[in-house]
UniProtKB/Swiss-Prot annotation:
Localization per Swiss-Prot or TrEMBL: Cytoplasm
Annotated organism of origin: Methylibium petroleiphilum (strain ATCC BAA-1232 / LMG 22953 / PM1)
Pfam hit, one: GidB
Protein name: Ribosomal RNA small subunit methyltransferase G
Keyword terms, alphabetized: Cytoplasm, Methyltransferase, rRNA processing, S-adenosyl-L-methionine, Transferase
Major subcellular location class: cytoplasm
Any GO MF annotation of the entry: rRNA (guanine-N7-)-methyltransferase activity
Domain of life: Bacteria
GO cellular component, one term: cytosol
Family: Belongs to the methyltransferase superfamily. RNA methyltransferase RsmG family.
Amino acid sequence: MTVAPFDAKALAQGLEQGAQALRLELTAVQQQQLLQHLALIDRWNRVYNLTAVREPAQMLTQHLLDSLAVVAPLRRQTRATAIALLDVGSGAGLPGVAIAVACPEIHVSCVDTVSKKASFIRQVGVELGLTHFQALHARVESLASSNFDVITSRAFASLADFVTLTEAALAPDGVWMAMKGQVPHEEMAVLPSSIEVFHVEPLQVPGLDAERCIVWMHRKG
């Protein structure tokens, strides 16, 4: 299969239009950092198989804009304050890198159990010059007592497994931000009794003809 070349100009235009649709104000530097992340995914993917998506234009929509779609909801939830966020099963750094770029006030940690993916994310942080950012090659269970304010995941596990595996790393008043496709009613129905869904937030990803949502959760009481 022939893969389309990395057309930086077209991708820059697509990113700008997507950010406008999401009502995100990105500086020229932030836009360049996001495009650089995309270029790194495209380059490393040929060797490390970071994602099944091969076309750069599809990467822009399905990965980058999909990740940026959570920025405004995240800022509303955290009131744009300095918090610590953990991205579990980050893979190619999604959504963690996009959040770190768009929200420099947030300290982002991306964790993945696959060494090559953690190495890639670490390299992205270095090349993009991200501060308040780290990549971890570890199992999330090893991060107990880390007190993250927000724990997110884009394609990690069922909601029950997600909260069970990460609860020890969540701050007492922290929240989970699970990125999902269709509203996962069946998964929500079998959450541990101590966990509560307090909001299901629909997302509209520019250029993506698919349902997306955030399932917001916290501990009861």
